[in-house]
Amino acid sequence: MQTPVNSFKAALREGPVQLGFWLALAHPDIAEICAGQGYDWLLIDGEHGPQTLPGIVAQLRAVEATPPCSAIVRVPGHDSVTIKQVLDLGAQTLMVPMVETAEQAKAIVTASRYPPAGERGLGGARASRWGGYPAYVAEANAQVCIIAQIETATAVDNIEAIAAVDGIDALFLGPADLAATEGLLGASSFDALFKLTGEALARIVATGKPAGILSRDERLVQQFLDGGARFIANGIDSFTFAKGAGDGLRRWRERIAAQGGV
């Protein structure tokens, strides 16, 4: 076998919980730094981050150079051309936002698989090492991993139907968008959101498909750990950098003020 084995996909089925981190700043150095910290996976955010295709390739290379960390690419939407392009870049695991129905899930899977299992177009791109992996087309389908994001009330209603689609490997809850669609934004609504995410998690786990979440709120992360989630992201590069820079500034401002402004 020449096509790299998707270690993240394999780890979803067995082994410890996979811990990840979000890359929103679109820089390969940040990807390399974070991969070197020991994360199991990093998500390259092509939905909200300022990503370009060459930039995604650079981040993929940075993660690949720092094993055993795996890269996930979140594509901007359901567009089949974008899915094909990102897979051709060498990504093996894709996260797809705003999946609300089984029909959408089936179309995403179809776009990610070579015929006869799907409709992904053939091209001599980086994923096949520009033709250097002659067996790539025959081997690629088994290594592709598709994660459907559950982010709306409609998606929650359809959890079981989405999970039942062959080729959907995992479901990932988006608590921020879910809170927005349910009118649960703000600290005063946290208890209701916590109840909603707990119920959604239990339903995902009951389907037998791995569940995941991103949250900077430790209560939600712990809820998913306790509830059987298989992969969790606990931070975002942009927020982590902003907090570190701000905390350092405030600490020294306070120290200087305590010394009379010296």
Swiss-Prot record:
Functional description taken from the UniProt entry: Catalyzes the reversible retro-aldol cleavage of 4-hydroxy-2-oxovalerate to pyruvate and acetaldehyde.
Pathway(s) it belongs to: Xenobiotic degradation; biphenyl degradation
Amino-acid positions noted as binding substrate in the UniProt annotation, renumbered to this chain: Q149, A176, D177
This protein's record includes keyword NADP: no
GO CC annotation terms, alphabetical: cytoplasm
Name the record gives this protein: 4-hydroxy-2-oxovalerate aldolase
Site residues (Transition state stabilizer), renumbered to this chain: R74
Alphabetical list of Pfam families matching this protein: HpcH_HpaI
GO terms under biological process: catabolic process
Residues of the active site: H48
Keywords: Aromatic hydrocarbons catabolism, Lyase, Magnesium, Metal-binding, Plasmid
